[in-house]
From Swiss-Prot:
Short sequence motif named DDXXD motif, residue ranges: 345-349
Domain of life: Eukaryota
Job of this protein: Lyase that catalyzes the formation of isoprene from dimethylallyl diphosphate via a syn-periplanar elimination mechanism in which the diphosphate-leaving group serves as a general base.
Subcellular location per the Swiss-Prot or TrEMBL entry: Plastid, Chloroplast
Cofactor: Mg(2+); Mn(2+)
Positions with a binding annotation for Mg(2+) 1: 345, 349
GO molecular function, one term: magnesium ion binding
Binding site for Mg(2+) 3: 489, 493, 497
Entry protein name: Isoprene synthase, chloroplastic
Binding site for dimethylallyl diphosphate: 345, 423, 486, 489
Organism per entry: Populus canescens (Grey poplar)
Gene: ISPS
């Protein structure tokens, strides 16, 4: 098969809609000219399959998005107007946060609202100073003697920002038998705050474990008739998934709509939140145009018909991992890698023969373009696309930061492909590994380590040797979010994978290893998720080896895992709810603020 050593730039038609089903047009799209450097083009490559060789099919749902429609951000002039307005509103909110005369509870609730509305990144230093002031003046000791709501709220905010506070703060709300006081149930707002705080627990913090059980049992008993519609919506939202496990953009859009219904809403804060949400959304649209052009040029979605095309879902995932506007490079890098992972996973899981998979794994390990001579045609296409993309990412990093990261990127891919290969061997041998053997491989095959290594080089400006060495060893900040990724994925996909004949899954392996029912195995996996979350919470306390932006990115990957797999596998089989979420985050602006 011949390959062209050309760089092709083909314009994209913007006459269709992003979603193939009719949807309201939100923003007028405008064309964008983008040049991309590449060494090998895969766009005009074709291949033929061996007709006599049987290939499995997973019958995946087809892609439901139309890449011909790429939304644009507003004009530069409009963005500048928005920036000026946002700057003025931001100054007003900053004054409120820095008001040393404000009552502590008022300040804490303001900080909580700022963060829920998606504005925390604008006020990081202000919030830290305010919390420092709160702690140094004895504020935390004071609120623990006043109300459960104030105690739980301050506890959660302080732990979120790396302060070491003791679970003993809640001991004062227990009776002589060690049970939480029954009269606390009369204050739903306080119970809701206690529930949210309990998810910041560390290993061995039994008081917080008891607090969660106590809060959940009461919150589930409440009805809208008893507490009112507004509070009932908050309770249901929290019980579905706690705040600490939600992605920030989805939480922001939900919180904005909930907050604007409040009679006592801070109108300046609300206006800034809506403006900020729409401004960041315009950045996502710009990023998506760039990534979509790359995907069309790569051409894998149209050439490899057996595999899932999930670029939009991969980009949406990347927004959850790094939502801040300054992290476009991270979003694009993670989206590209997850798109590749999705297709290559299908090659290993469904389409490739074991001999072919071993050849592909060897090619990735060697990272030599000449290795394509040993590959079947469809793998040549995939390997060249991967080879070009990763080399380009490494080149850009060398040019911009002076660091050759290619060995780290290629090792991450080699490790992933070896993990995929091990799973393929289990499948071909029709063997079910023990849970320990399975999981020791599966957290790597989740692609979590790979995504986080690519994310590290995108969000960290000053790359440190010690950090890189620990990345290579898959430090806890890499492994633990990946554990959560794998466990959440397995909970959501177990039934479908069993139907496809795949023998390795956390649930099925746990059933076989422990000799228990599917129900008990599922419960055990959920407990493993909880315990891993507690271990990961410690990364924010006592100072991490890694820079804060990367720590947040790693935690966000775990959050995105919770959200993506909470009600099924929203990446493999995106449903209507998933599509609505994608549209709300990427394309549909929030209606303007009106006084």
């Amino acid at each position: 098969m011949a390959t062209e050593l050309l760089c092709l730039h083909r314009p994209i038609s913007l006459t269709h809609k992003l979603f193939r089903n009719p949807l309201p047009k939100v923003i007028q799209a405008t064309p964008l000219t983008l040049k991309l450097r590449c060494s090998v083009s895969t766009e005009n490559v074709s291949f033929t399959e061996t007709e006599t060789e049987a290939r499995r099919s997973a019958n995946y749902e087809p892609n439901s998005w139309d890449y011909d429609f790429l939304l644009s951000s507003d004009t530069d002039e409009s963005i500048e107007v928005y920036k000026d307005k946002a700057k003025k509103l931001e100054a007003e909110v900053r004054r409120e946060i820095n008001n040393e005369k404000a009552e502590f509870l008022t300040l804490l609730e303001l900080i909580d609202n700022v963060q829920r509305l998606g504005l925390g990144y604008r006020f990081e230093s202000d919030i830290r100073r305010a919390l420092d002031r709160f702690v140094s003046s004895g504020g935390f000791d004071g609120v623990t003697k006043t109300s459960l709501h104030a105690t739980a709220l301050s506890f959660r905010l302080l732990r979120q920002h790396g302060f070491e506070v003791s679970q003993e703060a809640f001991s004062g709300f227990k009776d002589q038998n060690g049970n939480f006081l029954e009269n606390l149930k009369e204050d739903t707002k306080a119970i809701l705050s206690l529930y949210e705080a309990s998810f910041l627990a560390l290993e061995g913090e039994n008081i917080l474990d008891e607090a969660r059980v106590f809060a959940i049992s009461h919150l589930k008993e409440l009805s809208e008739e008893k507490i009112g519609k507004e509070l009932a919506e908050q309770v249901n939202h929290a019980l579905e998934l706690p705040l600490h496990r939600r992605t920030q953009r989805l939480e922001a859009v939900w919180s904005i709509e909930a907050y604007r219904k409040k009679e006592d809403a801070n109108q300046v804060l609300l206006e800034l939140a809506i403006l900020d949400y729409n401004m960041i959304q315009s950045v996502y649209q710009r990023d998506l145009r760039e990534t979509s052009r790359w995907w069309r040029r790569v051409g894998l979605a149209t050439k490899l018909h057996f595999a899932k095309d999930r670029l939009i879902e991969s980009f949406y995932w990347a927004v959850g991992v790094a939502f801040e506007p300054q992290y476009s490079d991270c979003r694009n890098s993670v989206a590209k890698m997850f798109s590749f992972v999705t297709i290559i996973d299908d090659i290993y899981d469904v389409y490739g023969t074991l001999d072919e998979l071993e050849l592909f794994t060897d090619a990735v390990e060697r990272w030599d373009v000449n290795a394509i001579n040993d590959l079947p045609d469809y793998m040549k296409l995939c390997f060249l696309a991967l080879y070009n993309t990763i080399n380009e990412i490494a080149y850009d990093n060398l040019k911009d930061k002076g660091e050759n990261i290619l060995p780290y990127l290629t090792k991450a891919w080699a490790d992933l492909c070896n993990a995929f290969l091990q799973e393929a061997k289990w499948l071909y041998n029709k063997s079910t590994p023990t849970f320990d053997d399975y999981f020791g491989n599966a957290w790597k095959s989740s692609s979590g380590p790979l995504q986080l290594i690519f994310a590290y080089f995108a969000v960290v400006q000053n790359i440190k040797k010690e950090e890189i060495e620990n990345l290579q060893k898959y430090h806890d900040i890499i492994s633990r979010p990946s554990h959560i990724f794998r466990l959440c994925n397995d909970l959501a996909s177990a039934s479908a994978e069993i139907a496809r004949g795949e023998t390795a899954n956390s649930v099925s392996c746990y059933m076989r290893t422990k000799g228990i029912s599917e129900e008990l195995a599922t419960e055990s996996v959920m407990n493993l998720i909880d315990e891993t979350c507690k271990k990961m919470n410690k990364e924010k306390l006592g100072g991490s080896l890694f820079a804060k932006p990367f720590v947040e990115t790693a935690i966000n990957l775990a959050r995105q895992s919770h959200c993506t797999y909470h009600n099924g596998d929203a990446h493999t089989s995106p449903d209507e709810l998933t599509r609505k979420r994608v549209l709300s985050v990427i394309t549909e602006p929030i209606l303007p603020f009106e006084r």
